[in-house]
């Protein structure tokens, strides 16, 4: 698990909360973005990147709607802009 996800855990064994999922997706998005910059013709990875971005977007919308305090915390911790 990434360092960012470790900071957002609710408890020791937390792997499925929205906050942790967003942190893990953010790491995956950063990795895929770097890969696609190097290999521009890799269409399968670009599809995977779009899926990860859309999944993170849905999770952020859920947090904004249901747990606004946590939403603000996630945005500041992960340096995301909204």
Swiss-Prot record:
The keyword rRNA-binding applies. GO terms for molecular function: rRNA binding; structural constituent of ribosome. Gene3D superfamilies: 6.10.250.3130, S15/NS1, RNA-binding (1.10.287.10). It comes from the Bacteria. SMART domains: Ribosomal_S15. GO terms for cellular component: cytosolic small ribosomal subunit. The keyword Transit peptide does not apply. GO terms for biological process: translation. HAMAP family: Ribosomal_uS15_B. This is Small ribosomal subunit protein uS15. It comes from Pelagibacter ubique (strain HTCC1062).
């Amino acid at each position: 698990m990434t360092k960012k996800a470790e900071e957002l855990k609710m408890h020791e064994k937390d792997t499925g909360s929205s906050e942790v999922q967003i942190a893990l997706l953010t790491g995956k998005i950063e990795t895929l973005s770097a890969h696609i910059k190097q290999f521009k013709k890799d269409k399968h990875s670009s599809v995977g990147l779009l899926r990860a971005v859309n999944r993170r977007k849905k999770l952020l919308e859920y947090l904004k709607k249901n747990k606004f305090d946590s939403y603000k915390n996630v945005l500041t911790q992960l340096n995301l802009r909204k």
